[in-house]
C-alpha cells in the first residue's frame, strides 16, 4: 500500500511539470516572436549584481522548487546572482513574479571554459528559498535518461536574448521554432564537424531562426506525445559568424545525457 501510494505520488509529480496553464501559441514566425505571457512558466532570467543594478545575463529552467538548470558558461564564482521567475517582460515588475537569490552554484565537474566544444556546459543553481508553484511559475520536465530526438523533431527555444546578431535585447520573452538536426548531419564537415559531440543537441541551421546572446542557459522545449513539454537542451553556443548562420545550428547541452548528475546534485545538496 505504501509502495503504491509512493508510486502514485511520483507519477502525479511527473505529470505536474511541463503543462503550462497558459498554452503557448506556436505559429512559425521568421526570426522568432513574442511568447504568449507565462506560456513557458519554467523559464527564468538569471541576473547578476552590477554596482547595485541587476542585469540579465542568461536564461534557465526551474526543474525543482529549489533548483534552476542553466549553462556552466553563464556562471562566474565572483558574481552575486538572483533568479527572476514568472516574468514575461523584464522591464516590468509583474504581479506573481518573484526574484530569489542564489545560495549555491554547482557547475559540472568536467566543464572546462577553455574547451567549450568538449561539452558538459551545465550547471545547477540552488535558490535561497524554495518557490511556490503557480500558473506563472511551474517546473520544466526533464526527458528520460539517454533520450535522443530524431532529425527534424520540432522544438522551441525561448529566452530574452538578442533579436539578431549585434541587435537589441528584448524586454518580452521570445520564442522560436527550431528543428532538431541529428548528430550524423550536424557533425558533417559542412556543418559543425568535430566541434559537436554526442553530449550535445543541434537545432536550427536554416539561417533564419536561432538562439542568440542572452539566450544562453535557457531551455530547448520539445513536446512529447502526451502533450507535456520537456527540456531537452540548454543553450550552449552558436557560430562566431552570427546568430542565424546557415548550416550552423544552435548547439545545446543534451539534458538527457546528464539526468543522473542532475538527480545526484539535487539529492546531495
UniProtKB/Swiss-Prot annotation:
PANTHER family: CHYMOTRYPSIN-LIKE ELASTASE FAMILY MEMBER, CHYMOTRYPSIN-LIKE ELASTASE FAMILY MEMBER 2B. Coiled coil: none annotated. Its EC number is 3.4.21.71. Belongs to the peptidase S1 family. Elastase subfamily. SUPFAM superfamilies: Trypsin-like serine proteases. The keyword Cell cycle does not apply. Residues 17-28 form a propeptide. Residues 29-267 form the Peptidase S1 domain. The gene is CELA2A. It comes from Sus scrofa (Pig). It is an enzyme of class 3 (hydrolase). SMART domains: Tryp_SPc. Interacts with CPA1. Interacts with SERPINA1. The active site is at residues 73, 121, 216. This is Chymotrypsin-like elastase family member 2A. InterPro entries: Peptidase_S1_Elastase_sf, Peptidase_S1_PA, Peptidase_S1_PA_chymotrypsin, Peptidase_S1A, Trypsin_dom, TRYPSIN_HIS, TRYPSIN_SER. The lineage of its organism: Eukaryota, Metazoa, Chordata, Craniata, Vertebrata. It is found in: Secreted. It catalyses: Preferential cleavage: Leu-|-Xaa, Met-|-Xaa and Phe-|-Xaa. Hydrolyzes elastin. Elastase that enhances insulin signaling and might have a physiologic role in cellular glucose metabolism. Circulates in plasma and reduces platelet hyperactivation, triggers both insulin secretion and degradation, and increases insulin sensitivity. Disulfide bonds join 58-74, 155-222, 186-202, 212-243. Pfam families: Trypsin.
Amino acid at each position: 500500500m505504501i509502495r503504491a501510494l509512493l508510486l502514485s505520488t511520483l507519477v502525479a509529480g511527473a505529470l505536474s511539470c511541463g503543462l503550462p496553464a497558459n498554452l503557448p501559441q506556436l505559429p512559425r514566425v521568421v526570426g522568432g516572436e513574442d511568447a504568449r505571457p507565462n506560456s513557458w512558466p519554467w523559464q527564468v532570467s538569471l541576473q547578476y549584481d552590477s554596482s547595485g543594478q541587476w542585469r540579465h545575463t542568461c536564461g534557465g529552467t526551474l526543474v525543482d522548487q529549489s533548483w534552476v538548470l542553466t549553462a556552466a558558461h553563464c556562471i562566474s564564482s565572483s558574481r552575486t546572482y538572483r533568479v527572476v521567475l514568472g516574468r514575461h517582460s523584464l522591464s516590468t515588475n509583474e504581479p506573481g513574479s518573484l526574484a530569489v537569490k542564489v545560495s549555491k552554484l554547482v557547475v559540472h565537474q568536467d566543464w572546462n571554459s577553455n574547451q567549450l566544444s568538449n561539452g558538459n556546459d551545465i550547471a545547477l543553481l540552488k535558490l535561497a528559498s524554495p518557490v511556490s508553484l503557480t500558473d506563472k511559475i511551474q517546473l520544466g520536465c526533464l526527458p528520460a535518461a539517454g533520450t535522443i530526438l530524431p532529425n527534424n523533431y520540432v522544438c522551441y527555444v525561448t529566452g530574452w536574448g538578442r533579436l539578431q546578431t549585434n541587435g537589441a535585447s528584448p524586454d518580452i520573452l521570445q520564442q522560436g521554432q527550431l528543428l532538431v538536426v541529428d548528430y550524423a548531419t550536424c557533425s558533417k564537415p559542412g556543418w559543425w564537424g568535430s566541434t559537436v559531440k554526442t553530449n550535445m543537441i543541434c537545432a536550427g541551421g536554416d539561417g533564419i531562426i536561432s538562439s542568440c546572446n542572452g539566450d544562453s542557459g535557457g531551455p530547448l522545449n520539445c513536446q512529447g506525445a502526451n502533450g507535456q513539454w520537456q527540456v531537452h537542451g540548454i543553450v550552449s553556443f552558436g557560430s562566431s559568424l552570427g546568430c542565424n548562420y546557415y548550416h550552423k545550428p544552435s548547439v545545446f547541452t543534451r539534458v538527457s545525457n546528464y539526468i543522473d548528475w542532475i538527480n545526484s546534485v539535487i539529492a546531495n545538496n
